[in-house]
Curated annotation (Swiss-Prot):
Protein name: Pre-mRNA-splicing factor PRP9
Pfam families: PRP9_N (PF16958), SF3A3 (PF16837), SF3a60_Prp9_C (PF11931), zf-C2H2_jaz (PF12171)
Residue spans, zinc finger Matrin-type: 280-310, 421-452
GO MF term set: RNA binding; zinc ion binding
Protein encoded by which gene: PRP9
Provenance organism: Saccharomyces cerevisiae (strain ATCC 204508 / S288c) (Baker's yeast)
Amino acid sequence: MNLLETRRSLLEEMEIIENAIAERIQRNPELYYHYIQESSKVFPDTKLPRSSLIAENKIYKFKKVKRKRKQIILQQHEINIFLRDYQEKQQTFNKINRPEETQEDDKDLPNFERKLQQLEKELKNEDENFELDINSKKDKYALFSSSSDPSRRTNILSDRARDLDLNEIFTRDEQYGEYMELEQFHSLWLNVIKRGDCSLLQFLDILELFLDDEKYLLTPPMDRKNDRYMAFLLKLSKYVETFFFKSYALLDAAAVENLIKSDFEHSYCRGSLRSEAKGIYCPFCSRWFKTSSVFESHLVGKIHKKNESKRRNFVYSEYKLHRYLKYLNDEFSRTRSFVERKLAFTANERMAEMDILTQKYEAPAYDSTEKEGAEQVDGEQRDGQLQEEHLSGKSFDMPLGPDGLPMPYWLYKLHGLDREYRCEICSNKVYNGRRTFERHFNEERHIYHLRCLGIEPSSVFKGITKIKEAQELWKNMQGQSQLTSIAAVPPKPNPSQLKVPTELELEEEDEEGNVMSKKVYDELKKQGLV
């Protein structure tokens, strides 16, 4: 096959994969939100969309049909397969070199046209096969293409991911990443400590130490050099890491592993745990060193190198357990709550709960009664019509609540937001609700428009929305202020009419603070009473 045709075919397949991924995210935006929320935890520098765009997308997601968790995780694993195919084709594309004659004749337009005509002749008789090839590629990644009967949509997976089975990836108790199956490790932990007095909740308390950056090192449940403890942590760390990647299939596993390994090599091993009182902690030797110089000399010593070579795998697994458990903090909290509920169940309640989990686990990821495409749009249109009836011809334009979703109509009406108030001064802007309307008189917009009318804003103008009324009030205020200023000017006093204060009008104060006239004060002073 011609190299140009090979490159074109690869680009075509990559574009088909891109469209297939976009189609799934458009159908169910939760696929993207489930990924981006965890990605921002793992990679804090992730550039998130603008807050306004997130709010708009939340409304968009709100209008979509709510899908089951099993379906969300299943499609994420399917998209992960698509991404692997995409990367393979991209690598193949990059390895294919362009023909030498094309490189030499890049700027020769006649030669390029001649080669193009030659290609057209070669492909003229292959149009039908070409169309069939494109359709087969599209069907390979299309939704529901794995269904045995094309007329009945029974399996949401594509033909490419036909063999994908989530029940082979998750156990029943894990519920597709909702809970962690830690009871098996509780049994192993009892064998490690050689005691039977540690309950499952106490074991979960021990695991909570790994959510803290220091406690699992400084206050470990056992001696960190104990062989049984080391073997146990290796198994637990492996499980938590596997659980993380199968719960968040869209995260780049290589990038996450490289990030954790880089932090371990360049920060953790170099004494990331520091204390002003104790100094620097060495995780391999479990010792504190007072100063940086002492710690640096310790790193090149024989004892440290021996401990590092002997315990490196354990310390790295311990660190990975700490990091992945922090990423899975929500799942760990849900697991703990679920364990507490199970312990409070009676035998019958426990059996009923297990039956519910089994039904969810065995139920298909896709239900044939789910709305798709035009059916979903029709449902949205019906909802819109109901809202139009409620809002007297308005579209579905509810303000957002604290959760970022549109406010329910009953709450919208309860706050009086269905009532409109128009302000002519603010260019006929309409305010919904009395509270918003009252507040706008103190806002910059209203004050600015008053000043544009030549009016100095004050509380007197609160409640006035008509331009004419505001101007008339301002003129009246100006006239009254002029009259008041004239009346406030006092006449010049006549020096001959100035009144001289008498002795009775003058006041004195004794040592105790009593105030009296000067005449009375003088009399009392003569008598020695003050």
